[in-house]
Regions:
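A short beta-loop-alpha structural element at the N-terminal edge
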Residues: 1-18
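Conserved GNAT-fold acetyl-CoA-binding loop/helix
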Residues: 18-44
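A short helix-loop-beta-strand connector motif used in the catalytic cores of GNAT acetyltransferases and
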Residues: 44-55, 73, 136
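Conserved beta-hairpin
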Residues: 51-67
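A short, internal acetyl-CoA/4′-phosphopantetheine-binding micro-motif in the GNAT/acyltransferase core
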Residues: 73-84, 108
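Conserved acetyl-CoA-binding loop-helix of GNAT-fold acetyltransferases
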Residues: 85-98, 116-120
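Conserved GNAT acetyl-CoA-binding A-motif
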Residues: 98-110
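Conserved catalytic-core motifs of GNAT/GCN5-like acyltransferases
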Residues: 106-108, 124-140
Length: 145
């Protein structure tokens, strides 16, 4: 069941950041290891506090998956490695598409699994940037549906 986290507490933001890192270490093999601490700080200090957060909890009341949105854009979607392949990502994306009007997402070009996931969800590439927003050499695909 999708739940909106209104005003997440610091311990919840920490738990989401930990989930982010576990997920990234499995799915973002193209990242330079030294970039992970930089992005982790950015996620915890900037991205999560700025986003409207939706979660799916695991059986122990922790987080199995989460997404963050801003306006009509999906800003982030991460699933715990142990919860991958169970439809949680699809459930989260469909929830915010229906209830929040989300229709845009950016994805790392090197993340073929995520690009394929979004293509199966009906997203199409509308543009590409050679660098990510922090100026690093991780091309970004801008998708819409």
């Amino acid at each position: 069941m999708v739940e909106r986290l209104a005003s997440p507490a610091a311990h919840e933001l920490d738990a989401l950041t930990d989930l982010w890192e576990r997920s990234v270490r499995v799915t973002h093999d193209f990242l330079a290891p030294e970039d992970i601490p930089f992005f982790r700080r950015m996620v915890r200090q900037e991205a999560l506090p700025a986003a409207e957060i939706y979660v799916i909890r695991d059986s122990g009341n922790g987080f199995a998956a989460f997404e963050g949105i801003g306006a009509d854009r999906l800003e982030m979607l991460f699933v715990a490695p142990s919860a991958r392949g169970k439809g949680l990502g699809r459930e989260l994306v469909e929830h915010v598409a229906v209830h929040c009007g989300v229709r845009r997402v950016d994805v790392n070009e090197q993340n073929a699994q995520a690009a394929g996931f979004y293509a199966r969800m009906g997203f199409r590439i509308v543009s590409r940037d050679a660098l990510d927003p922090s100026g690093r050499p991780y091309p970004i695909l801008h998708l819409e549906r």
